[in-house]
Amino acid sequence: MKIAFFTETFLPKVDGIVTRLTKTIEFLTKNGDEVIVFCPEGCPDSYKGATIVGVAAMPLPLYPELKLGLPGPAVSDKLEEFKPDLVHVVNPAVLGLGGIWLAKTNNIPLIASYHTHLPKYLEHYGMGMLEPLLWELLKAAHNQALLNLCTSTAMVNELEDKGIQRTALWQRGVDTENFRPELRSEKMREKLFGKYQNTDSLLIYVGRLSAEKQIERIKPVLDLSL
């Protein structure tokens, strides 16, 4: 199968979306599928056998880490040359909307996936009044797809409540070779505890430090457990 991805987030950026995409691409190419990825410029030319096509992009004003790709005629030409059997749009934004339009106009089956909870970002950055409008835009985009993949059951339920149709859960995978109880290390625990007393409980947060992550919500739980 030949699969075309449209994503606003890709290498060299590292986050949960990129990790999921790179693992998916690696699995697909390993099993004989052909993959092309359209993403913001600054990316590598290839990854694990997949062709990567960078497009001109601009940073999102409220969130400069995220670049919005600007699809042009070259994207259409490259897609026509590749002749995909399936288009997968990741978090439809500017580049993603271009992917949706190209899939629809060329009668290519389309799926989409929802990763970044953009409506909640507006709330954290003082623009909550725009949340209803953004939901309407997301609904219009996602309802073009034959299938909308969500990364949690909570998001499946919320998207359905907002009128987004044909949702399904895209569960996370765990590499059991790298993450298993047998690899427990007392030396690593001591390093992580540092100057603090080594107790039975060790909580680790792995992720970005940003307002929308709401890391502060864990403090009341920690206070109750101490």
Question: Across the structure, where does each feature detected by a protein language model lie?
Answer:
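N-terminal subdomain of nucleotide-sugar transferases
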Residues: 1-56, 220-223
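Active-site proximal beta-strand in glycosyltransferases
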Residues: 3, 86, 103-121, 149, ...
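An amphipathic, basic-hydrophobic alpha-helix
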Residues: 61-89, 95-101, 105, 132, ...
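Short beta-strand->alpha-helix junction loop in the catalytic core
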Residues: 171-181
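A short helix/loop element that forms part of the nucleotide-sugar donor recognition site in Leloir-type
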Residues: 180-196
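Conserved donor-binding/catalytic core segment of Leloir-type glycosyltransferases
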Residues: 194-213, 218-223
